[in-house]
Curated annotation (Swiss-Prot):
GO molecular function, one term: magnesium ion binding
Cofactor needs: Mg(2+); thiamine diphosphate
Native source species: Clostridium perfringens (strain ATCC 13124 / DSM 756 / JCM 1290 / NCIMB 6125 / NCTC 8237 / Type A)
Residues binding thiamine diphosphate, per UniProt: 62
Metal-binding as UniProt keyword: yes
The gene coding this protein: iolD
Protein name in UniProt: 3D-(3,5/4)-trihydroxycyclohexane-1,2-dione hydrolase
Catalysis performed (reactions): 3D-3,5/4-trihydroxycyclohexane-1,2-dione + H2O = 5-deoxy-D-glucuronate + H(+)
Functional note: Involved in the cleavage of the C1-C2 bond of 3D-(3,5/4)-trihydroxycyclohexane-1,2-dione (THcHDO) to yield 5-deoxy-glucuronate (5DG).
Signal peptide: none
Family under the similarity heading: Belongs to the TPP enzyme family.
Pfam families for the chain: TPP_enzyme_C, TPP_enzyme_M, TPP_enzyme_N
Length: 639
């Protein structure tokens, strides 16, 4: 079949399918584009001539559209993707951050950046990087460290092996992440006689591999000698759809479950054995129980520093680790005994073996008491008001900063109370999306849901700017559900271009913008380690040349209304509830500009986070923070 490389690529993508548990579905939904000279007349021509069943989407920012695609794949539990194409140079470079985000989170993302000429005839072409020591280097080489597979198509016939390997990685639960196929702009238009069998329908089967028997037997020996195990429910539980199996396992042996950010909403928040979020952004209940656990069973988790509290959370000297993970790389962390396979079938097999040996944990009332303590704390958090009895959750180091914000904006809302109102007002099956700032911590601790896959948090790369784009991605994946972006003013200012794409696609998204005039959580981290506030609040430069002037007020509702969104500006809890109710009635996208008081987010609960504090300073507070870091480090695992 004689066709161009671009045409062959489109035809190939249109014939890719996945099969999971007997259900077959199309894998590639479409292609996001921001056309430039390096892609529009090659791949662009192919998409115009015959896109097949692929939808062509128009992005507004290359990073933004790639975040949309990442969220789309995540919300589809990695079984459907939207590819992303860009021009050469800056357009391609804009997708590098999104590639890293997808790879860290093990989410399939196919990137198709245009590239310099393979022939080099017009070098240096517009937007080309030139390196005197290697003429073969282009901007697209920057994708290599952040992708799970990378290739450059210098000849049309190379497309075939490249795309087969791309699909291998994209559909492999253990290896998936970003894939970059760089497309030199001249090669895109080159014609070649491709064999017809390259375009046959391909069904990529996502299987449920079962670990070898020896791994189960060794795990059985460990568990039988443990009295107080805990389970950590990671993202692998979600993608394997193993939530019910995990709950059955926990109920059978009375083992409490703690959640990572990626694992939240895989099981019901209301379940008596679900303690909620664990670690640095975890809650009181989970961290209390984790401290004394003698066994940690990690299911589908990477054991990030936030989950393990920089490897200091599990204080029982007899603690051991078992991991159930489809990835051997992640399975070997923490010196864990590994069970390498699919979460669902491996948990079921392990349960059968433990039942045959009559295993049961020795918990009595510890789980109930821990949940009761957290319930009381939740009640306190959701009822914090800015009144005569107000006390900030984060002790302000800058005197008068809360009052200054309130006077300037009129805002009277505490962040934890706002989350309480949001949870009680929006639909039970609504999807909430987040990524960065103080909101992921508050949400992992406070957000409760019994609806599967309704919590969508990117906390592997914690990429500012993911939130709004990802909200559109989740909406494209599940158009019948309301989707809410939980975004701070810092992340909003970083990237919100795909609001326009949402308007274009006529897909309603809801943006809940928490404005506290700064990078609030980093200001907390900065000042809690003895440093004064420096470039973490949004302040004017003062007469002394420092960023110490007044706070910069921004009317975000007014800005968003210019894009065509229905907007609300709220300064009290009553206004917030009214806006949320009205937003549910709207057919267009909405933005609620919530003026939340600084220092009213949650703090940590018996968890430590290892950050690189200065080992020598003229500031007493920094020196004390360093001493505290060294003390905690001595109590933590070394690896």
């Amino acid at each position: 079949m004689r066709m161009t490389t671009g045409q062959a690529l489109v035809k190939f993508l249109d014939n890719q399918y996945v099969s999971f548990d007997g259900k077959e579905e199309k894998f590639v939904d479409g292609i996001f584009t921001i056309f430039g000279h390096g892609i529009v007349v090659g791949l662009g021509e192919a998409l115009y001539e015959n896109p097949g069943e692929l939808k062509v989407y128009q992005g507004r920012n290359e990073q933004g559209m790639a975040h949309v695609s990442t969220a789309f794949a995540k919300q589809n539990n990695r079984r459907k993707i939207i590819a992303c194409s860009s021009s050469v140079g800056p357009g391609a470079a804009n997708m590098v951050t999104a590639a890293a985000t997808a790879t860290v989170n093990n989410i399939p993302l196919l990137l198709l950046p245009g590239d310099s000429f393979a022939t080099r005839q017009p070098d240096p072409v517009l937007q080309q990087i030139e390196q005197s020591y290697n003429l073969g280097i282009t901007t697209n080489d920057a994708f290599k460290p952040v992708c799970k597979y990378w290739d450059r198509i210098n000849r049309p016939e190379q497309l075939m092996s490249a795309m087969i390997n791309a699909m291998r990685v994209l559909t492999d639960p253990a290896e998936t992440g970003a894939v970059c196929i760089a497309l030199p702009q001249d090669v895109q238009g080159e014609a070649y006689d491709f064999p017809e069998y390259f375009f046959k329908k391909r069904v990529h089967r996502i299987t449920r591999p079962l670990a070898v028997q020896e791994e189960f037997e060794e795990a059985l020996d460990i568990i039988m000698n443990k009295k107080k195990p805990i389970i950590i429910c990671g993202g692998g539980v979600r993608y394997s759809e193993a939530g019910e199996a995990l709950v059955d396992f926990a109920e059978e042996f009375n083992i409490p479950i703690c959640e990572t950010q990626a694992g939240k909403s895989a099981i019901k928040s209301s379940h008596p054995l679900n303690l909620g979020g664990i670690g640095v952004t975890g809650n009181l209940a989970a961290n209390m129980i984790a401290k004394d656990a003698d066994l940690v069973i990690g299911v589908g988790t990477r054991f990030s520093d936030f989950t393990t509290s920089s490897k200091s959370l599990f204080k029982n000297p007899e603690v051991d680790f078992i991991t159930v993970n489809v990835s051997k790389f992640h399975g070997e962390k923490m010196d864990a005994h590994k069970i390498i396979g699919d979460a669902k079938v491996c948990i079921e097999e392990l349960q059968a073996m433990l039942e045959a040996n009559n295993y049961e944990s020795s918990y009595e009332d510890e789980i109930v008491n821990a949940k009761k303590a957290w319930k009381e704390e939740m009640k306190r958090l959701t009822n914090i008001k800015y009144d005569e009895n107000f006390e900030a959750l984060i002790k302000p180091k800058r005197e008068g900063c809360i009052e200054e914000f309130s006077v300037l904006t009129g805002g009277l809302i505490t962040q934890t109370a706002a989350l309480g109102v949001i949870r009680e007002t929006i639909d039970d099956d609504a999807i909430v999306v987040g990524a960065a700032g103080s909101l992921p911590g508050d949400l992992q601790r406070m957000w409760e849901t019994d609806v599967r896959d309704s919590y969508h948090m990117e906390y592997g790369y914690s990429c500012m700017g993911y939130e709004i784009a990802a909200t559109l991605g989740a909406k494209l994946a599940e158009p019948e559900r309301e989707v809410y972006s939980m975004v701070g003013d810092g992340s909003y200012l970083m990237l919100h271009s795909e609001m326009v794409t949402a308007m274009q696609e006529q897909k309603k998204i809801n943006i809940l913008l928490f404005d506290n005039c700064g990078f609030g959580c980093i200001n907390n981290l900065q000042m809690s380690n003895g440093i004064g506030s420096l470039a973490t609040e949004f302040r004017y430069r003062d007469e002394n040349g420092k960023l110490e002037g007044g706070l910069i007020p921004i009317d975000f509702a007014k800005v968003a209304s210019g894009y065509g969104l229905k907007t609300y500006s709220v300064k009290t809890l009553a206004q917030l509830k009214e806006a949320l109710e009205d937003a549910k009635k709207q057919k267009v996208s909405t933005l609620i500009d919530i003026k939340v008081l600084p220092k009213t987010m949650t703090d940590g609960y018996d968890a430590w986070w290892h950050v690189g504090i200065a080992g020598e300073s003229k500031i007493d507070g920094v020196n004390k923070a360093f001493e505290n870091k060294e003390k905690n480090l001595k109590a933590a695992r070394r690896y």
